[in-house]
Each structure stands twice: as structure tokens, then as C-alpha cells.
Swiss-Prot record:
Domain of life: Eukaryota
Catalysis performed (reactions): a 1,2-diacyl-sn-glycero-3-phosphocholine(in) = a 1,2-diacyl-sn-glycero-3-phosphocholine(out); a 1,2-diacyl-sn-glycero-3-phospho-L-serine(in) = a 1,2-diacyl-sn-glycero-3-phospho-L-serine(out); a 1,2-diacyl-sn-glycero-3-phosphoethanolamine(in) = a 1,2-diacyl-sn-glycero-3-phosphoethanolamine(out); a 1,2-diacyl-sn-glycero-3-phospho-(1D-myo-inositol-3-phosphate)(in) = a 1,2-diacyl-sn-glycero-3-phospho-(1D-myo-inositol-3-phosphate)(out)
Record keywords: Autophagy, Cytoplasmic vesicle, Endoplasmic reticulum, Golgi apparatus, Lipid transport, Membrane, Phosphoprotein, Transmembrane, Transmembrane helix, Transport
Membrane topology: Multi-pass membrane protein
Domain remark from Swiss-Prot or TrEMBL: Forms a homotrimer with a solvated central pore, which is connected laterally to the cytosol through the cavity within each protomer. Acts as a lipid scramblase that uses its central pore to function: the central pore opens laterally to accommodate lipid headgroups, thereby enabling lipid flipping and redistribution of lipids added to the outer leaflet of ATG9-containing vesicles, thereby enabling growth into autophagosomes.
Protein source organism: Podospora anserina
Subcellular location per the Swiss-Prot or TrEMBL entry: Preautophagosomal structure membrane; Cytoplasmic vesicle membrane; Golgi apparatus membrane; Endoplasmic reticulum membrane
Topology feature Cytoplasmic, residues: 1-213, 284-434, 456-524, 573-618, 640-900
Signal peptide: none
Protein family: Belongs to the ATG9 family.
Name this protein carries in UniProt: Autophagy-related protein 9
GO-annotated biological processes: autophagy of mitochondrion; lipid transport; piecemeal microautophagy of the nucleus; protein localization to phagophore assembly site; reticulophagy
Length: 900
């Protein structure tokens, strides 16, 4: 609705700004980036006949298109929006293309593509049988009696995106699975479809979604009826002397309501009817998504509450692999569409990018501190303010303007010459949003107060301590959230951190406060004890004796008892250790938020005050939400318009286009091939440019390792381990104790030479033969292929997973005790090699044989890797190695020599 209002505003150019954006997108213009550039992707593509429909004006003259050919083209044959693109291609044509022999030309010099009739004649000529006249006559006779198949180009149906005619003709006999397959093959907006799949997952199935919507309408209707009855249909002046409800009810109260209340009821009726119709019309889409889960992903509706999102992603990837791309003949319009809607980009990273395309930009805006959220008041200028209301206005003012209906970034936001115009439009949107908040603030604030009062009153009455419970503020949630982190995964991480955050906040203040609390508890407890003992000897005194006028012993006993309870609650328990730094580190393990100025200061009181602004009592957050409806217009009118230029520059400089995925935030596209290499390099600070184009507070590293941990690559990020969001080199390594008793024990050493005792049938296949349990980090790291939710182009290189994974025999010999070198277990090693062969065969069956994979280093056994240290020792085995093994050994030697 607001977007349409903006589009109707008059402009000096005759067309509104938003009409230009829509017209610009429909033409398929790529922000000026196509000018002067060759389409290298389609340079060697096999174009078909219907591709020439878009190039009727091209003249084959010396193997290039000429301007003369364009002048001969009728105006009606040129599609709109293609003239400028064609001129750009012609302006940058290279003269070297003229050196083509005439024999290699498709048509002789001077030939002209006259249209479809000539192409049809050329195809008929291609069927002519070469040879003598008798042979050609026989061929024509056979062709007349048995004509060849019709090779006419495929023409798109005029029904648009509807099902094929064969499907419609037999729709009565089609089952739901075939229709689900057809809808999956004809998805037009992949971003929208993936979001629908994710929303269906979060809603726990169609039954839960419908139930939630019906109950929502019922709750809203109940609130409206209850408020109308309590405010308009009850005469409270008659309550004191009445005995029945009918005595205080106003007859025909609906006819006596005020005009404002009637207006509110009409608005409620409009909202109720609008939501009901919306829910009813949305049932068709819900059933389609249900069929997608049930028939294509094999996930029934009753499993939606227990299945994990990672399993859903794995099944979507398997479905994509079953329906691989087979079309090799695409029109330019279809290629432009596939540029952002390709189903080939559907692994865990791509799915998260499609769902979080808009939110990733907002996360980066908060991380880069681009948004000015201060209130322009003298006593609140240095305090950032953010509420849900302001979050909604940012979604409307910024994101709805940047992204089009297809979910892609508007091209004109990427052009520097439109910076001033777009910035002015953004300021006007901020001001319009502020006006709308001022108009709707009375209704919204009243609804929130009544809704939360009715919801939490009973809980507060039963458990008053709920008022002191804390939660993260909306600003803290956007600061803690990571790139490509889906909402349910982020909420899970926050919920796990709240217990540690509460424990941290309970440690402040302590010493002086506990001293005062102990004194108050002692005095109040002593007085309450004296009054209680006196009431035991004389119960009548307890009820009737007045210590002060109209205040009996019972009253003061209750007062002193309450004071003692409050003072005792302010004291820490005896078994609680005061260590704020340790408590804050536990919080950071889950929030992944540690600004640079927090380092080495986690114990300070300043850090506690800063964290208290992010973790506030729920009652304070609720009051800020109510007041935020009144203060948000000040931020929209005065603070945010000042940073509109920086916002436009941010979208232009931090937007990246990925083939098959579209435009995404640069921070959201994880460079898996460089992340681990950068994590192992010491940070040298960098220059100002690197600091500007990088995320703050380690957000990129935390997002990368958090993503790897969420989607199951335990080789890079063990799930649930302390410091799991940190790089492997920054986590504390586990050092197992040595075996006991030692192998140098004479009785044990003698027995082990002739015995097979102590061998386990469940030994890890990743441990090298002969490598015992010893102190230090693990020698062999699992393969990065442990994550099946990433495509090969997203997997990190194998040599970056664990550069020290190769075994070093001389180090093993140094750690052995004097009697261990005499122990020989040749039969054990032979059996271990046989088991490795079986395990390697099992891995090939699970992951395939590596066809089409970018990295092939993991095709060899991790336990048999070579390095510069052990290449000489195992030199006898290299003579029988194949070409792949020799290349692998050479790469490992190079990486080891470089110290990677």
C-alpha cells in the first residue's frame, strides 16, 4: 500500500521513480555493467533456431553484424529493450573477427537472415540426399512415403505458466505426486518457494498452521468483544448495590456507543474479514507445500514437529540431484531468468542465502554501525534506541525500496550516478513512515497494553519474580545474529545463552550490596521472630493487639517477613563463586559477541553496564516498546535521514552477484576456500580499506564456523564443543592421558609380542596403523566431506582442514618408551589395512566416486598420507603408486614445504 502511494506522487520527468524501477527491471538491464562486455558465458553456447527470433536484424557480413543490417531490420521485428544492448555489442566488435575463411561461414557472404521461411527451407535442404540423380530420386520417394520427424522449434504455450495441455486433459487421473513434481519443475520464483518451504517447516505442518491462524482470529475477536462489553455495556455506578449481572448491563448498549468506539469496531471488522479471506485463499498454497513435503521429500505431516531443518535441506538437495538440468537450448530471456533462479544452486549455503537475502543486509548495517538510532533529545543523544516498531519501519523504508517484487536488488541502486536521487527518495520514505506511526500510535499502543496485560496478569499474580526476569533487547538480537543464520537456529542459540547471562548479571553488584542486605535481613528477621514468639504465648494478642493505630501484630509480622525475604534474595548462595570473567566467557560461547574493547576487560564493571543495555528485564523491554511508538517518529524524522547517503553507498559497495543465485550481500557469501587459511594467518591489522570492507567484532569468522557447525561438518566445527564458533586453532585441545600401564612393563611387553589382547574391533579408521594414543592434538582430521549439505564448490580445500594430519613416524618414535620399539604387530597392521580398504569402499558408496567434484585429495586414505617427513621412510610403497597418488603426494609435499 505505501509503495503504491509513493508511485502515484508526481515527478518532474513524467514517470515516477518506482515506475522507472519496474520498467528498468522488466527490460532486464544489468545496471550498466553489460556495456562493453562480452557474454563469455554464452560465447560457445549452442544456440537454436528460436534464439534467432531475438536477432532478426543481424546481418552475416564478414562473420559479424553490421549497422547496415540493423537499418534494414523492420521496427516491428525488434523487441523492446534490445536495441540498446545490440548497439553496445556492435560498438565493441573486434576487427580481428573478420579473418574467417569463407568456407567456415554458416552462410555465404551477403546472405541475410530473412526470417522463419528461409530457415525452414534451409532445414528442408539439409534433408537432401547427396549423390547421383537416381539416388536423390529414391531418397525423395522414401521421404514422401515416410516423412522425417518434424524439427520445428518449440513454441511456448499461450497459457503462460499453466500446466501442459496433456496434464489438463487428464487431470482427473493425475495423482498428487505428479502434480507436485510438475509444480517443482515449474517454480518461477525460487526465493519465494524456498521461503514457503521454510515457513511451513517452522509452522510444524499444515494442521498446526491452520490451528494457529484460527486461534489468532479467535483471540482477536475475543479481545474486541471483551473490551466492548467492559467499556460500553456495563454501568459501573450500579455495581455496589446490585446482586445480579443483568442489573448492571446497559440495554441496547451497541446503539449508545461513541463515534470513536464505532470507528474502532469498524477497523477491527475490516481487519478480521481481511485476515480471514487471506487465510482462506492461502490454503491452496499450503496444500501445495504439503504435497511437496509429503510426495517429493517423503516427510509426512506428523513428522514435521520432530524433523530437523538439516534433514529437510539434505532431502531438497537429493531432489535437486534427481532432477538435474537437461535443457541445453534456452532463449536469452530464459538465461536471464536462470541467472538468479537456477535450481543447481540449492545447497545449505544457497538455501540460507535465499531465505536470508534481505535480513543479511540488515545484519551488516547493524554490524557496520551505519544506522543512526539515537533520539534527538538533550538527555538521550548518546543512547541508541531500537524497538520492534522501528524494526518494522526499517523493513518498509529501506528493504522494501531496495528489493523488487522478485526479491532481487533493484539495478539502479548499484549505479553511482543515481545516488543523490535515491537518497532523496529514501529520506521521503523515512518521513512518510514517521507520519504513519504518529497516526497509528494511539491504536497500536492501546492494543499492546491490553493484549500483554490480559496475557501475563495471571502469571505475574502467581509468580511476581517474573517481573525481574531478563531477556535480550531487539537491538541485541540484531547485534548477535550471524550471516545466513536462520531464525530458528538463532533463537535456539539465544535460549541456550540466557541461563549463563542471568548468572552473569546476578554477580553484580555484590560486596557492598550484600553487606547492606545481610544487615537488613538480620534486623527484619529479628523483629518478625519476636512478634511470632509473642503470638505463640498469647494468640489473642497476635490478632487484636495494635502496635500502631489500626496496625496489629499480624500486619507487622507480614511486613517484616516480606522485607526479610527481599533482603535474603539479594544475597548470593554460599556455593556460588564470584567470577564475572568466567561467567561472561560462558555467555560469549553462545552469543558469539565480543567487541574489541571487551578483550581483557570481561571482569570490569563497565562491561557489565554495557551488557546490561543488551540484556534487560522484560518489564523494561515492554515499557520501551510502548514508549517506542511515541519516540520512533523522532528517529525517523531527524536521525535516520542523516545517514541515507551512507545506506545507499552500503548497498552499492557491499552487493555481489552470483550466477544462479542473484544479488546477495558480500558478507553472506562465505568463501569456504579461504576462511580456514585466513584463520591460520596472524592478523596484522590491515589498512583502512580492508577495515572498511570487513565485518566488525569477528562477525564473519563467527558466522562461518557457526554455519559449519549447524550443518554438520564436525571435522571443522564439533557441535556442542566449547568454543565451537571459534577456529580450530583457537580452541583448547583435548590431551588424553597416556595408556596405563605403560607398554615398557616387562610382563606386558612379553605378552603383547605373542598376544592380541587389547585390540578393539571398534578402532577409529581415521587413526594410522601403529599410531597409539599419545598426548597432543589428533594426528588425523576427518574429511570435510563429512558435511553432505554443501556442494563441491563450497567445500574447503582438503589441505586447509588440518595441515598436521599427516603422520610423523619420527615424532611417534620419540614419544615411545624404551621397550615399545621391540613390539611388532605386523598381523595387526595387515588387518588394519584390510579394514581401511573396506571402509574406503563404504565411503565411495556413500559419497560417490568423486565425479564432478572440485577436490580429489580426499580420495586417498587419510591414514596413508605422505609428507616431507615420512616420504623417505615409506619410499618403498611409492613405486607402486598410480598417477593420482603421485600427484597427491606432490601436492602434500608442496603444502608442507610452504608451511600451510
Amino acid at each position: 500500500m505505501p509503495r503504491k502511494l509513493f508511485s502515484k506522487m508526481p515527478t518532474t520527468q513524467g514517470r515516477s521513480f518506482y515506475e522507472e524501477l519496474r520498467g528498468h527491471d522488466s527490460e532486464g538491464y544489468d545496471g550498466g555493467s553489460r556495456a562493453g562486455l562480452l557474454d563469455e558465458e554464452n560465447l560457445n553456447h549452442n544456440f537454436q533456431d528460436y534464439d534467432l527470433d531475438h536477432a532478426e536484424g543481424l546481418t552475416v557480413d564478414d562473420s559479424r553484424a553490421t549497422l547496415a543490417g540493423l537499418r534494414k531490420t523492420p521496427a516491428s521485428k525488434v523487441p523492446p529493450g534490445h536495441q540498446n544492448d545490440r548497439s553496445m555489442w556492435l560498438a565493441h566488435d573486434d576487427d580481428a573477427d573478420n579473418d574467417v575463411p569463407p568456407s567456415l561461414l554458416v552462410e555465404p557472404r551477403g546472405a541475410h537472415l530473412a526470417g522463419k521461411p528461409k530457415r525452414k527451407q534451409s532445414r528442408q535442404a539439409a534433408y537432401t540426399m547427396p549423390g547421383s540423380s537416381n539416388t536423390r530420386a529414391q531418397w525423395e520417394t522414401i521421404q514422401a512415403h515416410q516423412p522425417l520427424h518434424n524439427d520445428e522449434p518449440f513454441t511456448q504455450s499461450h497459457r503462460g505458466n499453466g500446466a501442459p495441455g496433456s496434464l489438463f486433459s487428464g487431470s482427473a487421473s493425475l495423482d498428487a505426486k505428479k502434480m507436485a513434481e510438475w509444480r517443482w519443475a515449474n517454480v518461477q520464483n525460487l526465493d519465494k518457494f524456498i521461503k514457503e518451504v521454510y515457513d511451513y517447516y517452522r509452522g510444524c505442518g499444515i494442521k498446526a498452521i491452520i490451528t494457529e491462524r484460527v486461534l489468532h482470529l479467535g483471540n482477536v475477536a475475543f479481545i474486541a468483544v471483551l473490551l466492548t462489553f467492559l467499556t460500553q455495556c456495563v454501568d459501573y455506578s450500579l455495581v455496589r448495590g446490585s446482586q445480579k449481572l443483568s442489573q448492571i448491563i446497559v440495554p441496547q448498549c451497541t446503539r449508545k456507543m461513541s463515534g470513536w468506539w464505532n470507528l474502532g469496531l469498524w477497523l477491527f471488522a475490516f481487519y478480521f474479514i481481511w485476515k480471514a479471506i487471506q487465510y482462506i485463499l492461502d490454503l491452496h498454497r499450503l496444500f501445495h507445500v504439503r504435497d511437496f513435503y509429503t510426495h517429493l521429500l517423503n516427510i509426512p505431516d506428523h513428522d514435521m514437529q520432530t524433523i530437523t531443518w538439516q534433514e529437510v535441506v539434505a532431502r531438497v538437495m537429493a531432489l535437486r540431484n534427481q532432477n538435474s538440468k537437461t535443457a541445453t537450448t534456452l532463449t536469452p530471456l530464459q538465461r536471464h531468468f536462470i541467472g538468479s533462479q537456477s535450481k543447481e544452486r540449492l545447497d545449505a549455503s544457497d538455501i540460507a542465502n535465499r531465505i536470508m537475502r534481505r535480513e543479511n543486509y540488515l545484519i551488516a548495517l547493524f554490524n557496520k554501525d551505519i544506522l543512526d538510532l539515537t533520539i534527538p533529545l538533550p538527555f538521550l543523544r548518546n543512547r541508541q534506541y531500537f524497538s520492534r516498531t522501528l524494526e518494522w519501519t526499517l523493513m518498509f523504508s529501506v528493504l522494501d525500496m531496495v528489493f523488487d517484487e522478485k526479491g532481487q536488488v533493484n539495478q539502479k541502486f548499484l549505479r553511482a550516478d543515481r545516488r543523490g536521487e535515491i537518497s532523496e527518495k529514501l529520506r521521503s520514505r523515512f518521513q512518510f513512515a514517521g507520519i504513519m506511526i504518529l497516526v497509528l500510535s494511539p491504536f497500536v499502543s492501546l492494543y499492546l497494553v491490553i493484549y500483554y496485560f490480559l496475557m501475563y496478569y495471571h502469571e505475574i499474580q502467581k509468580n511476581p519474580s517474573v517481573l525481574s526476569s531478563r531477556s535480550y533487547t531487539p537491538l541485541a538480537e540484531w547485534k548477535f545474529r550471524e550471516f545466513n543464520e536462520l531464525p530458528h537456529l538463532f533463537q535456539k542459540r539465544l535460549d541456550m545463552s540466557k541461563a549463563f547471562a542471568t548468572h552473569y548479571m546476578d554477580q553484580f553488584p555484590k560486596v557492598k550490596t550484600e553487606m547492606v542486605a545481610k544487615s537488613v535481613a538480620f534486623v527484619s528477621g529479628a523483629l518478625a521472630t519476636v512478634l511470632a514468639i509473642a503470638s505463640v504465648f498469647d494468640p489473642e494478642l497476635f490478632l487484636g493487639f495494635e502496635i500502631t493505630p489500626d496496625r496489629t501484630v499480624l500486619f507487622y509480622t507480614a511486613i517484616f517477613g516480606s522485607i526479610w525475604a527481599v533482603a535474603h534474595g539479594m544475597q548470593s548462595q554460599d556455593d556460588v563463586v564470584f567470577d564475572p570473567e568466567y561467567a561472561m566467557r560462558n555467555v560469549i560461547e553462545y552469543t558469539h559477541y565480543e567487541p574489541d574493547h571487551w578483550k581483557d576487560r570481561l571482569h570490569s564493571y563497565d562491561i557489565k553496564l554495557e551488557f546490561a543495555e543488551l540484556y534487560k528485564p522484560k518489564i523494561v523491554i515492554f515499557l520501551e516498546e510502548i514508549l517506542g511508538i511515541l519516540t520512533t517518529p523522532f528517529v525517523l524524522f531527524f536521525s535516520l535521514p542523516k545517514c541515507s547517503d551512507q545506506i545507499i553507498d552500503f548497498f552499492r559497495e557491499f552487493t555481489l552477484h552470483i550466477d544462479g543465485l542473484g544479488y546477495v550481500c558480500t558478507f553472506a557469501e562465505f568463501d569456504f576456500k579461504k576462511a580456514m587459511a585466513n584463520a591460520k594467518k596472524p592478523s596484522d591489522g590491515g589498512d583502512v580499506r580492508d577495515e572498511y570492507y570487513s565485518a566488525k567484532h569477528g562477525k564473519m569468522e563467527a558466522s562461518y564456523y557457526g554455519f559449519i557447525g549447524n550443518y554438520g561438518n564436525f571435522a571443522l566445527n564439533p557441535k556442542g564443543a566449547p568454543g565451537s564458533h571459534l577456529p580450530p586453532g583457537m580452541r583448547n585441545q583435548f590431551h588424553p592421558p597416556p595408556a596405563w600401564p605403560g607398554l615398557n612393563s616387562p610382563p606386558l611387553g612379553a605378552d603383547m609380542q605373542t598376544s592380541r589382547m587389547g585390540r578393539s574391533e571398534f578402532r577409529s579408521r581415521s587413526r594410522a596403523p601403529g599410531q597409539g594414543l599419545r598426548p597432543g592434538p589428533s594426528m588425523v582430521a576427518p574429511s570435510p566431506m563429512a558435511s553432505i549439505l554443501l556442494d563441491p564448490h563450497h567445500l574447503p580445500p582438503s589441505h586447509l582442514v588440518n595441515p598436521g594430519r599427516a603422520s610423523h613416524p619420527h615424532r611417534v618414535q620419540q614419544n615411545r618408551r624404551p621397550g615399545e620399539s621391540n613390539i611388532i604387530e605386523e598381523s595387526l597392521e595387515d588387518e588394519e589395512r584390510g579394514r581401511e580398504g573396506v571402509n574406503r569402499h563404504d565411503d565411495e558408496e556413500v559419497y560417490g566416486h568423486g565425479d564432478g567434484m572440485d577436490e580429489s585429495a580426499w580420495q586417498t586414505s587419510p591414514a596413508r598420507t605422505l609428507s616431507r617427513d615420512n616420504s623417505a621412510i615409506e619410499g618403498t610403497g611409492t613405486a607402486e603408486a598410480g598417477v593420482v597418488d603421485m600427484i597427491y603426494q606432490f601436492n602434500q609435499a608442496q603444502f608442507t614445504r610452504n608451511g600451510v
